[in-house]
UniProtKB/Swiss-Prot annotation:
Keywords: Amino-acid biosynthesis, Histidine biosynthesis, Hydrolase, Methionine biosynthesis, Multifunctional enzyme, NADP, One-carbon metabolism, Oxidoreductase, Purine biosynthesis
Pathway(s) where this gene product acts: One-carbon metabolism; tetrahydrofolate interconversion
Origin species: Hahella chejuensis (strain KCTC 2396)
Family matches, as HAMAP family: THF_DHG_CYH
Gene Ontology MF: a single term: methylenetetrahydrofolate dehydrogenase (NADP+) activity
Alphabetical GO biological process terms: L-histidine biosynthetic process; methionine biosynthetic process; purine nucleotide biosynthetic process; tetrahydrofolate interconversion
Name assigned to this protein: Bifunctional protein FolD
Amino acid sequence: MTMTHAQNNHHARLIDGKQVAADVRANVAEGVKARIDSGLRPPGLAVVLVGEDPASQVYVKNKTKACEEVGFLSQKYTLEESTTEEELLKLIDTLNEDNAIDGILVQLPLPTHMDADNILERIKPDKDVDGFHPYNLGRLAQRMPVLRPCTPKGIMTLLARTGVELRGKDALVVGASNIVGRPMGLELLLAGCTVTITHRFTVNLPAKVSQADIVVVAVGRPGIVKGEWIKPGAIVIDVGINRRDDGALVGDIEFNEAAERASWITPVPGGVGPMTVATLMENTLYAANHLHKD
């Protein structure tokens, strides 16, 4: 009886993504200062935005602001919606050859007349600070990561902050996108977890969630994972960010119900989101220090 009572009063500890991201950015700023103090140039990040998608404009603003805060050289290229794929590829070629630029970021989604895969593959792998290039995903799959996809790597930083040993844990990734789900599975595998990735053809999602010590959900559908499915004591990471009809921002997981069962949980907003940009800064500094020696 007491145990049930204790469990009912249980509330997960929050993983504060804002705080961890601030720590990561402070470390990057120190690294930039050390570079400049030793006579090297500041790391450079080029951000390319095509068209006028409002969400993309906000993301680009956040990224360029973060660049300036840590002392990077930040170059922003805003192209018309009507820009041809050929013109964008030409810009990428120019940035690939620019020694002041360590990272090239093309903000997604791109207009429908462009082949995003073709464009992302044109970025030199050693400047692919988003970690989307097949070369970088392949390195991660072969256990020799160089530039790692930002959101999964940021989540690994959050998991490290819990102090929980990841080896041997059963980890479940809900959602199999190229940007989050698949590389997330590879990151957890690298950390010694036993990994399951679920997708639209998965049968009996609740049973799979209820077995998992670590649950990472990245689907973009509010409440797709019910709180009652969570295994007591699990670590819950919510990558989703959805706007409800009443204007509230919510994740993919039923937060309040999940927080009653989990040991650790990320809030939305203020969980995974800030880590993506902080990790982009980390990757750009890494590229400057280790991949570009000029």
